[in-house]
Amino acid sequence: MNLEVEIERHSGFCGGVIRAIGRAERFLEEHSGETLYSLGDIVHNEAELRRLGGKGLVTISKEDLGNISKRAFDGKRRFDRLVSLSNHSDRSHSRSLSLSKRTGQSNNNSQGATLLIRAHGEPPETYSLAESLGLTVIDCTCPVVLRLQKSIREAYERLKPAGGQLIIFGKIGHAEVLGLLGQVGGDAVVIENMAMLLSKIEDGGILTDRPLEIFSQTTKSPVEYSLICEELSVRATAGIKVHDTICSQVASRHEELAEFALRHDIIIFVSGASSSNGKVLFELCKTRNPRTYHISEAAELSAGWFSDGDKVGICGATSTPGWLLAQVAEAVKGFSGR
């Protein structure tokens, strides 16, 4: 069986994920033996999480923050006791100061562990909690998300005096959306799709006779967002302001993948099971090419999917590492000659 294999050239990590993983790896290289705690998965890809876990990155939830603070305190207390016995307390003080300098963060309590905020961003209370626990924070919030958070705060300040409403198109419970809600104390309406929009209007959750402003989670479908905004514009009687907040890198991927899917006989889409962006892009490929298969790793490939002479396209989400795409491509090539 002869197969022609091509990896879509723009597939792989987006800029925000590259930045977050780069900073995590740099910290782990410079602080050998130390643990770096990521608040939530740094990327929604199981294979990449295993790779980073091998280097010392530990994923935790918000409920774990108090525990890592206590572990860091206990470890520091034991360290100080040993240093005191050796008459090297000055060296311990210097080490604590240099830790804050190397991470680029100020920290009044050098006893804390180091916490990484991933590209999705966090609500303000997360930073307050980390500070109260004495944790050193490495903030890897994507610059695109930071701008969106700022825009949402400003919109809320405009809308509140006029009794208006803030609407967010995004996945309920998604880390980025939770971070956005946190900017306005949760006082916004989140809609996941057109059906939810219509339902909210019907039951009074969205008041179309008041000023409205709508934003999108940065990784959502541009086409779906456009349709939702059009529907709202027709119904809003007191005016609506639509904000273009989908990441340009994500938006361009939709057009590129649609074209890529059409010019191949079969598409192998690679992404983690929990990737929201992966679900959206997989469905996009599937609508363009029915012979589209979703896998998380090369071991899930099946020789029965392929036919002699197939042009095989391999692509992935913004959370799919390039090394994994290359691994899948090599595995597909291995079916040739069978």
Describe each region flagged by the PLM.
Residues 1-81, 99, 107-338:
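The feature marks the mature, well-folded catalytic cores of soluble enzymes
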Residues 83-87, 93, 98-106:
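Short Gly/Ser/Thr- and charged-rich N-terminal loops/segments
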